[in-house]
């Protein structure tokens, strides 16, 4: 999100504009919406949803998904890890996540396991905006954040290193563009346009601007098989 708090920015915004251009459309309108509300609004309020959606069997039952990235999860902490956060033992800590993401689910599962092991639960703090999370991590309100590895990398760059990745990337999974299942024509157009961006290096170029070029896939699959 830009400094005005209203204008969406990031590689998904740039990819969305590139898809529209390939499809011969005007640039179109990119609107910000709370993460959990995007998929239910496809086909009514929105034509396409592109917001780091991890492809899951549950989402593929709701909408068509066209893959374009393979992204893992990563821990982010303030520079120097002042809270001494231990990725191998997050029990009893306060962790920020973006609402509705795979990381929110994963953090809740970790917390449940902590309690089952007789340890203190994790305080999982959902937020709509990653920028809000970054501010609270830097100020010391939270111990760590859990997000897409590409998000952690971008946040680190934007914060000039005030937030850094801690540990290795894990739980890699494909992400996709979401389209209403009833709109087969738009689905096919998005898949073809995404493949064009891949084949001609445009997708990698866009991602490189955010340090995320290694996440690019080479085949835009429709509803790929996932666990």
Q: How would you label these PLM feature ranges?
A:
Residues 53-60, 108-109, 139-171:
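A ligand-binding cleft/hinge motif common to bilobed small-molecule-binding domains
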Residues 28-40, 82-83, 122-135, 171-173:
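Short helix-initiation/N-cap motifs at beta->coil->alpha
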Residues 13-22, 94, 101, 177-214:
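Extended ligand-binding regions for polar small-molecule ligands
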Residues 2-3, 16-26, 103-126, 156-158:
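Ligand-binding cleft/hinge of the Venus flytrap
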Residues 78-95:
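Flexible hinge/capping segments at coil-to-helix
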Residues 70-77, 157-195, 213-227:
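Periplasmic-binding protein-like
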Residues 105-124, 164-165, 195-227:
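Ligand-binding clefts/hinges and TM-proximal coupling segments of bilobed small-molecule sensing domains
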């Amino acid at each position: 999100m830009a400094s005005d708090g209203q204008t969406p920015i990031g590689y998904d915004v740039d990819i969305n504009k590139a898809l529209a251009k390939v499809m011969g459309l005007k640039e179109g309108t990119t609107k910000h919406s709370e993460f959990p509300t995007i998929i239910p609004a496809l086909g009514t309020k929105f034509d396409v949803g592109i917001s780091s959606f991890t492809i899951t069997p549950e989402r593929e039952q709701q909408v068509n998904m066209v893959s374009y990235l393979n992204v893992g999860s990563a821990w982010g902490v303030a520079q120097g890890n002042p809270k001494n956060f231990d990725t191998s033992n997050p029990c009893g800590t306060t962790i920020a996540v973006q609402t509705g993401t795979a990381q929110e689910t994963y953090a809740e599962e970790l917390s449940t396991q902590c309690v089952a092991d007789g340890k203190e639960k994790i305080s999982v703090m959902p937020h709509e905006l990653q920028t809000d999370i970054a501010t609270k991590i830097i100020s010391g309100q939270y111990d760590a954040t859990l997000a897409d590895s590409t998000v952690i990398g971008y946040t680190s760059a934007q914060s000039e290193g005030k937030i850094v990745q801690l540990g290795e990337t894990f739980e890699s999974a494909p992400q996709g563009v979401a389209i209403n299942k009833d709109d087969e024509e738009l689905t096919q157009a998005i898949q073809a346009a995404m493949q064009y961006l891949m084949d001609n290096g445009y997708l990698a170029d866009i991602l490189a601007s955010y340090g995320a070029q290694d996440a690019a896939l080479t085949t835009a699959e429709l509803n790929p098989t996932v666990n």
